[in-house]
């Protein structure tokens, strides 16, 4: 959520930033917010005048009573003033509700580093690692490799649940589990993150706090009876871990890593990468989340992105890093990098991680602040997160990049200790 004071003082600048964001955002709502804000402030002035008058009149009552004078008119006036104040309070509550409704639907302001552009084709490659994998045979897609090796079963998952679900079997299940352990071990032992195992369901307030709601409710799986939501990413519970709290400045940055299952309806994605493991309704992911001071956040974003890159390098999977343009930035991020791995069957790079700085956008929604010391004024933290990385897509990338002509798949060396010393899946 944006700072209302910032909108008040820089409305034209904010309109321009949102106009260029590529989401076809209706900037006239900024004028609506300003109008409501002005109305609210005018009413607050009137309320203060009325309260001052009521206090003044009220202070005269004891003196007049002591003098034996009739105070019925003054008491009646006090009652009228109180009723008038109560009416204004009701009006203020309605205005606040309208302002909140609009503010929750205004996207974040892009950082000046974000390139112009409308679609993912306008994203800018920052760097790449290793050349795309070449084969002297016709490579297969990961869904065929997995099915042939009997380690992925899409057909039976479709029978048991529906489309875009998967059974991992045998060494496929072990590969998935090995990646989870390897990612968690790397980020905790080498990169200094504290591991969190979060709930897989959160309440509506948590989804609002990280920006999934109200805009993306159709993409979420909801438990209707309790108004709980299955998490689309561990970002939601881990960020909300400190909702409505004031952190200590000397504890920042806080760095957490969390493994979780993730659940997404992927509404509107029909026909887009829906075969195989790339776009599932349920998938596993290891998430990196940071809470920082404002002046630390962009340096910490670079570190977080490098942490995610480390596991891809150690796995030996070719990848690139792209800076996301304004039109592809999404609702909550101020600046975002995507890590994309090479997928031979697609003959292109496929996103495996998004690393974002939200600045104070989520912190304002979730009311997460910090104080430098006991006497300091609380300030909003900056929140960051990134996949470290998506497990299913990593399995897909390993199957495709490490496939052999005989149909087997070589296991990356870094995973072999987790795979019982096995060198290949046959």
Swiss-Prot record:
PROSITE patterns reported in the protein's UniProt record: AA_TRNA_LIGASE_II
Pathway noted in the entry: Aminoacyl-tRNA biosynthesis; selenocysteinyl-tRNA(Sec) biosynthesis; L-seryl-tRNA(Sec) from L-serine and tRNA(Sec): step 1/1
Signal peptide: none
Reactions it catalyzes: tRNA(Ser) + L-serine + ATP = L-seryl-tRNA(Ser) + AMP + diphosphate + H(+); tRNA(Sec) + L-serine + ATP = L-seryl-tRNA(Sec) + AMP + diphosphate + H(+)
A GO term for molecular function: serine-tRNA ligase activity
GO biological process, one term: seryl-tRNA aminoacylation
EC number(s) reported in the record: 6.1.1.11
Key words, A-Z: Aminoacyl-tRNA synthetase, ATP-binding, Cytoplasm, Ligase, Nucleotide-binding, Protein biosynthesis
Keyword match Iron-sulfur: no
Compartment list: Cytoplasm
Main location: cytoplasm
Top-level lineage group: Bacteria
Main enzyme class: ligase
Residues noted as binding L-serine in the record, renumbered to the chain: 233-235, 287, 387
Cellular component, GO annotation: cytoplasm
Residues holding ATP: 264-266, 351-354
Comment field on protein domains: Consists of two distinct domains, a catalytic core and a N-terminal extension that is involved in tRNA binding.
Subunit structure: Homodimer. The tRNA molecule binds across the dimer.
Family, per entry: Belongs to the class-II aminoacyl-tRNA synthetase family. Type-1 seryl-tRNA synthetase subfamily.
Role this protein plays: Catalyzes the attachment of serine to tRNA(Ser). Is also able to aminoacylate tRNA(Sec) with serine, to form the misacylated tRNA L-seryl-tRNA(Sec), which will be further converted into selenocysteinyl-tRNA(Sec).
Protein known as: Serine--tRNA ligase
